[in-house]
Amino acid sequence: MKHRYLPATEKDKQEMLATIGVSSIDDLFADIPENVKYKKEHQIKKAKSETELTRELTKLASKNRDTVQYASFLGAGVYDHYQPVIVDHVISRSEFYTAYTPYQPEISQGELQAIFEFQTMICELTGMDIANSSMYDGGTALAEAAMLASGHTKKKKIVVSKTVHPESREVLKTYAKGQYIDVVEVPAADGVTDLDALRQTVCENTAAVIVQYPNFFGRIEPLKDIEPIAHQGKSMFIVSANPLALGLLTPPGKFQSDIVVGDAQPFGIPSAYGGPHCGFFAVTKKLMRKVPGRLVGQTEDENGKRGFVLTLQAREQHIRRDKATSNICSNQALNALAASVAMTALGKNGVKDIARQNLLKANYAKQEAKKAGLTVMFDGPMFNEFVIKLDEPVRAVNKRLLAKGMIGGYDLGLTYPELDCHMLIAVTELRTKEEIDALIQELGDRHE
């Protein structure tokens, strides 16, 4: 054996060459012209031993900063939430430890039941009739919802509020470009969708209106006022929602939304450099056969026992091909399982309690910011995020906060040029009063 990771012996190589009918490695690559072959020695450094490599990688990893060492006030779509210990134990079981839906699904009854429970809990949170097995993330779920709306209504205009996550809007534009769909953005007014601008933008050619709940600035959009505007001209109403916030807020289904999407990251999925996540997709019953992705249904076998199957597969691209709603042919089964385990471990009361803690702690932070003389923007109903205006660039402030053991908020100037020197602060249930007070004191001292 010449190499611990490439164990083929000379005898093995000769047997393989003989099997394919050549006598040497050079003969194997004879079809490659000599003038394009690289004949010099590769200048590669001497390999490190396993011990040396472990030491080197540990040294590099120690440069990372995480939310265990640092109090994080960074949100903007990825949040530092409580993760029940049981989540990792369950998803690490060999029966579940795959990100993929099995190709012989009915054999994997445990996996299908877990997905079915995920779908059920998403329906309970959103107030919708049907949910799929998951999508890649919240952004792709939103884009898929827009494509469904355009295909269902036969219209080519999507109206989306600028208070929707900017990265989700970019994903939407990418999807829309290939389908020749126009994406029109509606401006914000005091941190929520400008209703007058929305009325002027929606027309008979509008396939859907998309808003976020709570929106990117943390504000609670008035869905009751937006819904009739969205549905004028028979367009569809799409809501991108934070599932944890739905533990307290009225579910979008109560406001006659047609599609509710979002990201299940708040439930049992770590921030992990921004992914992977787990999108969810829920609809009314009339759109059941237009839903992208996989659907798990409950049934009975020939002996009358309860069982689970992948159902309504004729919708999917491996059968309908170009007529399918979507080309998605996978999901985030492992992360959906993590979300399911987290929601189950918390229970209904636990979800409500954590949502309430987010609301109360964020509002405490906002009130303390006002007392410290900081300028709080877009004041109004919120969930766990709010915006403050700073006297200097957010990057500079965050650098100082990091030195004090805190991860600062999101720099809104990165995606909203008009909001340069504005910070989006997220406060979750994991933040303590002492951590919040330390943040406000640091921000307030610099403000003075």
Curated annotation (Swiss-Prot):
Enzyme class: oxidoreductase
Enzyme Commission code: 1.4.4.2
InterPro entries found in the cross-reference section: GcvPA, GDC-P_N, GDC_P, PyrdxlP-dep_Trfase, PyrdxlP-dep_Trfase_major, PyrdxlP-dep_Trfase_small
GO molecular function annotations of the record: glycine dehydrogenase (decarboxylating) activity
Residue ranges the record marks as coiled coil: none
Keyword Oxidoreductase: yes
Disulfide-bond pairs as recorded: none
Superkingdom, taxonomy of origin: Bacteria
Gene3D superfamilies assigned to the protein according to its UniProt record, in alphabetical order: Aspartate Aminotransferase, domain 1, Type I PLP-dependent aspartate aminotransferase-like (Major domain)
GO biological process: glycine decarboxylation via glycine cleavage system; nucleoside metabolic process
CDD domains named in the record: GDC-P (cd00613)
Pfam families documented for this protein: GDC-P (PF02347)
Catalysis performed (reactions): N(6)-[(R)-lipoyl]-L-lysyl-[glycine-cleavage complex H protein] + glycine + H(+) = N(6)-[(R)-S(8)-aminomethyldihydrolipoyl]-L-lysyl-[glycine-cleavage complex H protein] + CO2
This protein's UniProt keywords: Oxidoreductase
Subunit structure: The glycine cleavage system is composed of four proteins: P, T, L and H. In this organism, the P 'protein' is a heterodimer of two subunits.
HAMAP family in the cross-refs: GcvPA
Protein task: The glycine cleavage system catalyzes the degradation of glycine. The P protein binds the alpha-amino group of glycine through its pyridoxal phosphate cofactor; CO(2) is released and the remaining methylamine moiety is then transferred to the lipoamide cofactor of the H protein.
This protein's name: Probable glycine dehydrogenase (decarboxylating) subunit 1
Species lineage: Bacteria, Bacillati, Bacillota, Bacilli, Bacillales
